[in-house]
Amino acid sequence: MPKPRLIGTLSEKSLHAALKAYLTQPGDLIETSLDGYVIDILRGEQIIEVQTGNFSAMKRKLGKLLGAGHPVRVMYPLPVGKWIVRQTGSGELIGRRKSPTQRRPVEVFRQLVYIPHILPHPNFTLEILLTHQEEIWRDDGLGSWRRKGWSLYDHRLLDVVGQVTLTSAEDFLALLPENLPTPFTNRQLATILKITPGLAGKMTYTLRGAGWLAEAGKKGKAILFSPVNPHSSISLDAHPALE
């Protein structure tokens, strides 16, 4: 039986707390204990986890909950619009400007690289929440020398402007560009998507780990990759504990 906790968002950062409030519906259980883990939102049998940080931190938790038969939906905020807010060490506003950085759903692979074996599980769903956020920087002397003492103090949710739901192999493979040749190299993927070779490598590593991409020889020293028929059987027995 799930056990609700009385402690709410006191220890949470603003972004996580705001997203949880945005997602919560009447009847949901918040910060409920289930199978030894604290669940952000429990909606009937559905577990909803808000993950604003590194996915490696939730790898074991996801494996245990999915292995116990629970449907899990992970909500990951991606800031497609971001404003930089600079404050004094005491929190007084210095200035605010819009960041020119453009973020895209493919960047989620920076996190998915930690959980490729989780993705094919039939009870797993990933939702990328396209958000507008403020990034709060404070001149408190606590940041690194690279930041000249400025610290990244917090993230604030301004709005959720869209979402991308990834449930099936087809959903994840659809993040590959339509004009990608078959087979293809990491460099070709990076060039067409206009991303770094490092991110392209994370994409192919993750999709291979999920069983949706296979090596198809070499082109010179570069490995060639080809999508696997998503309707072919994917064995979950290779990862019995999903850890």
Language-model features and meaning:
Residues 1-38:
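Acidic-basic catalytic patches of nuclease active cores, encompassing PD-(D/E)XK
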Residues 19, 39-54, 58, 65, ...:
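Conserved catalytic cores of phosphodiester-cleaving nucleases, focusing on short active-site segments
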Residues 70-115:
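Long, charge-dense
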Residues 96-167:
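Long, low-complexity, charged/polar intrinsically disordered regions in eukaryotic proteins
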Residues 195-208:
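Short amphipathic alpha-helical interaction segments
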Residues 208-219:
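A short, conserved structural fragment
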Residues 218-242:
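Short, cationic-aromatic polyanion-contact patches
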